[in-house]
Every structure is written in structure tokens, then in C-alpha cells.
Amino acid sequence: QFYDSGAGFLERHTDPVGSHQSVVPILSMSSKGEDFISGGLEVEIDGKWHIVDDYVESGDLILMNGDLPHGVQKIDPEKDFNLYGSGRWMGLFAINKVAGSEKAPNSTPLNAE
């Protein structure tokens, strides 16, 4: 997935965890401070939000519990949008919905009622 500077983000949400998925493997394919300056993957732990990209660099593998509230803070919000410019790249290996299966639910937005 590509989160372009000036526009890329992902709303805070949780992903389903169950027999179809117990962990979300994420491959960091860019480095904060080189490919983008601000924003990044955030997770909530014990009521506090942490920016994961402050601790990883390109090539690192992140193993995350999808049930943790998470999202992507807007990447370089001070920059103008440029699809072919800088930004944040990641490889995501999650299974959020098995096609044709009602056993695996979809992601749940944090602001859902």
C-alpha cells in the first residue's frame, strides 16, 4: 500500500482476529525521515497512541494484533499532494475477509456506533 505525502492516511479502526487471522504481518518498505517526514502507522496501547514508524525502517517486519486500534496518521500533511512524489510504502499480508465467508468479519471503524 502507498500513502502519498500530502494526502495519504487511514482512519483509526480495528481488524477481526480469529481462526482466519491471529496476527497482521506488515513489511515496512520506507523509512520515516527519508521517504516521509511526519505521520505514519499508529497503534493504541493502554489508552495511548504510539507512532510505530518512529521505531522501524525499510525492511523491518512488524507483527501486530489486528484487534488493537490502529490507523495511519496523514503522511506529510504540510506538503502538496503529488502521487509520484514521496510517501510511505508498506506490504500488508492481512486477511480481513474471506470471499464468500460469513465467518470472518470486516474491519470495524473506531467511530462506528
Task: For each feature predicted by the language model, list its residue ranges.
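Conserved double-stranded beta-helix
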Residues: 1-33, 92
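Catalytic core of Fe(II)/2-oxoglutarate
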Residues: 21, 32, 36-113
